[in-house]
A protein has these predicted regions:
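Structural alpha/beta core scaffold segments of enzyme domains
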Residues: 1-403
């Protein structure tokens, strides 16, 4: 922060041909001490990126100038949250807003064969059914009408059997094609050290796929009009979501405005982004503001999961019980996309091809912190996961650390 602040002060000083010492900063606005000139950080940058190297000599803000640090500051949001006045994502409304419920296939990779909406049309408040390839939703004037219409609608799917049996998950995981092998640590002669050890200890640890299971299922509101889209969402990554929505809606990302609204949180990525994609695409297809509220079954069934992890470990001890060899193998998902590239359900089902899935840094803490004479740690990055994945955020990877 000090380096960035100093760089911005220097830029303002150069613009005005004054000394940096003659400038002050308050609430992101740079002013001359005389008060005759002022400019905000954002106006000074004028859309340019701030690429600054860390300057260890950049002056720190004097503690006497601190207005908040060290003070007991009242939380302005707490009273409304305690009394129920606070506006959460699930409470957000727009004038003329319609309500949609998503109709999903019974399993991954399902293809929509036919739709019979005759019963759904009889629901009071029914508006229409929208479909784009395998993306299917029912739109109504109220949320309860959407729930009833979704239950009444009959869809026929063709669903391939692509998932392994639960009991055979880790055998399946171990046999998946490997995209990349990495030797994290390799010291000494692990083969001979283990062969000559007085005692060998082996263990295998498996970590099941996990859902975030936020207390409130995902919700989003979108309003597509005039060739652009505004989305209200509790997404933690609105910048990445903006890029993905651009692909789904086939419009420039500059035409998409993301507005954050507090919702049920998670450490990683749950269904907020996917629900936002649902709302945006349905709004585009019906030409009206749309609210999409996932049910608990939607959240647990269709949010991206943390991928499984499989860890094989073996140690060799000498006659005195001291470790002389350590070998570990990690079978983890290969993140073949960046954080900017996570395939939304709306993209997958509407026929938009997206590459990659983001899994987080699953290799963290695969290395050994202890000093042993013979160590071999390998990471096998698997080419596929069979289902959409995301990061269950534990910087340091709880499964690796536990093992």
């Amino acid at each position: 922060c000090a380096s960035a602040r100093q760089a911005l002060l220097s830029a303002a000083a150069m613009r005005w041909q004054v000394n940096v010492a003659d400038l002050t900063v308050h609430d992101g606005v740079i002013s001359t001490r005389q008060g005759d000139r002022k400019i905000s950080y954002i106006a000074l940058l004028d859309g340019a990126a701030l690429n600054v190297k860390l300057d260890p000599k950049a002056p720190l803000k004097a503690y006497t100038d601190h207005k908040i640090v060290g003070q007991s500051i009242a939380r302005v949001d707490i009273p409304d949250k305690v009394t129920g006045k606070f506006l959460y994502m699930h409470d957000f409304k727009l004038p003329g807003m319609l309500h949609a419920r998503m109709i999903r296939p019974p399993g991954l990779g399902g293809k929509l064969l036919s739709v019979d909406d005759s019963a759904a049309r009889k629901v009071n408040g029914f508006v229409k059914v929208v479909r784009k390839h395998d993306f299917l939703a029912v739109v109504c004037q109220s949320e309860w009408a959407a729930v009833k219409a979704a239950r009444a609608l009959k869809a026929q799917w063709e669903t391939p059997n692509t998932m392994p049996e639960q009991a055979k998950l880790y055998d399946y995981w171990r046999k998946l094609p490997v995209a990349k092998n990495e030797a994290v640590i390799k010291t000494g002669d692990i083969t001979n050290a283990l062969a000559g050890a007085s005692q060998r200890i082996k263990a295998t640890y498996d970590f099941a796929p996990h859902t975030h299971g936020s207390i409130g299922p995902s919700c989003a509101v979108a309003d597509f009009k005039d060739g652009g889209c505004t989305v209200w969402s509790a997404s933690q990554a609105t910048h990445s979501l903006q890029a993905e929505l651009s692909t789904v809606l086939e419009i420039p990302k500059e035409r998409i405005r993301m507005i954050y609204v507090d919702g049920a949180g998670c450490y990683g990525r749950n269904g907020h982004e996917d629900c936002s994609g649902d709302a945006a695409l349905v709004s585009q297809l019906v030409g009206a503001p749309v609210r999409v509220q996932w049910m608990r079954a939607d959240e647990h069934g269709w949010d991206p999961k943390s991928p499984p992890t499989l860890v094989d470990m073996e140690a060799g001890l000498d006659a005195s019980g001291m470790p002389v060899a350590w070998r570990s193998e990690f079978f983890i998902a290969q993140a073949n996309g960046t954080l900017e590239e996570f395939p939304l359900l709306a993209a997958v089902l509407s026929g938009v091809k997206r590459k990659g899935h983001y899994t987080g840094n699953l290799q963290k803490n695969a290395d050994v912190l202890y000093q042993f004479p013979n160590i071999q740690t390998e990471v096998h990055r698997l080419a596929d996961t069979a289902f959409r994945t995301s990061h269950l955020r534990t910087p340091g990877r709880m499964q690796n650390t536990f093992a």
